Amino acid sequence: MAVTLKDIANQAGVSLATVSRVLNNDPRLSVSVETRRKIISIAEQLSYTKRPKSQVTGRRIAIVQWYSAERELDDIYYMSVRMNVEQAAQQAGFMTMTVFENNMDQIPQDIDGIVAIGKFSGHQLHLFEKLTPAVVVVDYDVLVGGLDCVLPDFVGGMNQAAGYLTTHYQNIGLIAGLELTTDGQRVRDVREKTFLNALKDCERYNPKLVKVENYTVDGGYKAMKELLAGPESLDAVMVTNDAMAVGALRALHEAHVVIPDQIALVSFNDIESV
């Protein structure tokens, strides 16, 4: 028997409308990160799939997430990207299969296309190309390797944020994320590099106000706790990922810091629930 939205709503303890809007990524919906995670987790556990609105073409696309299903629950950004890619592909009439980091060997040999989300090693990308010439990478610049890719304007966004913060604040911190490719190589985040260069250009760079942790809620929490415990004055903090910003906010609230009166906080990704 097919899983319905009502089944998910009953298990999550929320309304049918909330489930529908979360699973359809309604940008107008205001819901906590915890509720969103719970709904999506239940949908995954029940193997819920949306009915495509367009006529199915018979072609199959593998949506490959560089995280495991468990780790994805800690990063609402990559979860949102993956769900939106699935939705767009299904609406275009494609059949989709979701593949996580720990089961990439399940991608069939006759797959028609692959959308790879995240930071994959060159070796892994080569394996994808051996399966199909139709490979698109999301959120990782691999143009130099001859692959198509889609990613946000990290440089423009970070320069805009840096321009605002350096105009209004003196002591500016940065919480950046540690990312590794699927073979363990560190990826230097262009957001981190761009923001630090902007601070250096206007002589606001203070290495003691830069913290690098895992791109998770806990990572953001730990980094902000370290900044608050340090001897340096702090007026504003740039966080390069919304999941980390959730943790940073928790640390500020625990320290009874008034935002933005005492410390301003800016984060990147624009997840509506942050």
Predicted region positions:
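N-terminal helix-turn-helix DNA-binding module of bacterial transcription factors
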Residues: 1-57
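Amphipathic alpha-helical segments in well-structured domains
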Residues: 36, 82, 188-192
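Short beta-strand segments enriched in small/hydrophobic residues
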Residues: 20, 55-72, 171-181
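A generic structural signal for short coil/turn motifs at secondary-structure boundaries
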Residues: 26-30, 70-74, 147, 181-185
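Bacterial carbohydrate/catabolite-sensing allosteric modules
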Residues: 45, 49-50, 87-91, 130-134, ...
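Alpha-helical recognition/docking segments in bacterial nutrient-uptake
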Residues: 59-163, 227-229, 243
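Short, glycine/serine-rich, charged loops/turns that create anion-binding
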Residues: 23, 27, 68, 103, ...
